[in-house]
C-alpha cells in the first residue's frame, strides 16, 4: 500500500512539473543583477553610464590652509 502511494505521488509531481519545463525551461537571473556596478552604491572603480572614454574632471578644488576668518583654528 505504501509503495502505491509513493508511486502515485511521484507521478503527480512529474505531471505538475512537466508543463513548466515545456513552457520556457525555467527562470534565469539576468547577468546585470550580479554586476556590482549596477547595484546601489557601486564601488569606486565603476564608471557612470555614458562616461566611458571621457577623461575624469576635478569636481571641487579644496584648498587646505588658513584664512583671515578662521585664523588657522580647526574645529573638529
Curated annotation (Swiss-Prot):
Disulfide bonds: 37-46, 66-72
Compartments where found: Secreted
GO cellular component, one term: apoplast
InterPro entries: RALF
Signal peptide feature range: 1-22
Keyword Signal on entry: yes
Pfam families from the UniProt entry: RALF
GO molecular function, one term: hormone activity
Keyword line: Disulfide bond, Hormone, Secreted, Signal
Example of a GO biological process term: calcium-mediated signaling
Record-stated family: Belongs to the plant rapid alkalinization factor (RALF) family.
Function: Cell signaling peptide that may regulate plant stress, growth, and development. Mediates a rapid alkalinization of extracellular space by mediating a transient increase in the cytoplasmic Ca(2+) concentration leading to a calcium-dependent signaling events through a cell surface receptor and a concomitant activation of some intracellular mitogen-activated protein kinases.
Protein name (database record): Protein RALF-like 30
Gene that produces this protein: RALFL30
Amino acid at each position: 500500500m505504501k509503495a502505491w502511494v509513493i508511486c502515485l505521488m511521484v507521478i503527480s509531481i512529474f505531471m505538475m512539473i512537466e508543463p513548466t519545463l515545456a513552457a520556457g525551461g525555467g527562470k534565469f537571473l539576468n547577468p546585470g543583477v550580479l554586476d556590482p556596478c549596477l547595484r546601489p552604491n557601486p564601488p569606486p572603480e565603476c564608471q557612470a553610464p555614458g562616461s566611458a572614454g571621457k577623461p575624469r574632471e576635478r569636481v571641487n578644488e579644496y584648498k587646505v590652509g588658513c584664512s583671515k576668518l578662521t585664523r588657522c583654528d580647526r574645529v573638529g
